[in-house]
Amino acid sequence: MLESINFTGSFMTAQLRYDLHCHSTVSDGTLTPTAVVERAASRGVDVLALTDHDEIAGLAEARVAAARSGIEFVDGTELSVSWRDITLHIVGLGIDSESPALVAGMRAIRSGRLGRARLMGESLARAGIHGAFEGAARFAANEQLLSRTHFARFLVEGGHVRDVREVFKRYLTPGKPGYVEHVWAALADAYGCWSALRFHRRPGP
């Protein structure tokens, strides 16, 4: 998400380029936190937020890289929660990454991911695709955060589908062979960690 804002005044006109929603290899991105910052700098970004899924482990590295690149950095994350049988992804910006409530809340959210990933591997094996769990794990730099995106990359690499979009359509959405329903922390239960966030909300898949 790369956006720009134009500022105009009596004596000046300026454009601020910002990206406030990006992921690194700490969750399901393909670039390290440092590489994310370097990519943003090469594209003229002035303000950058790293918002990995349910993780803040990449913030310190990204913050150092941003200072080196002259980019204003915003600590962020993207929390996964359940509300009325719907999964929501809450993007928090300007967070307190040392907040005990936030750290504990994200740890609880992450705790079910590995079990879900194993069930996804078993489900895909029953559909004739073997070694999916181990294959997906090769794409995950953070073993605590194995996601559907990592399974998608494995399936594309193995030639089972043409691209990630087709993976989700054929295997990783409700009713498909590799989909495993997961209930995240309830929206109400996640409230305790929100004191560390200034957030906006968007629906998630």
Which functions belong to the PLM regions below?
Residues V26, R107, A141:
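Short, flexible active-site loop motifs that bind/organize anionic cofactors or intermediates
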Residues V36-V47, P100-A101, I109-A125:
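Alpha-helical scaffold segments that flank or form the walls of functional sites
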Residues A14-Y18, R39-R43, E98-A101, H130-G131, ...:
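A short alpha-helix capping/helix-coil boundary motif
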Residues G29-T30, L114-G115, E122, A127-P205:
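Divalent metal-binding pocket/active-site signature
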Residues L2-I86, L172-T173, P177, E181-R201:
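An N-terminally biased module of ancient metal coordination in phosphate/nucleic-acid-related enzymes
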Residues S82-L114, A152-T173:
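Active-site gating loops and adjacent loop-to-helix segments of metal-dependent hydrolytic enzymes
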Residues T77, G94-D96, G128:
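Generic hydrophobic/packing signal
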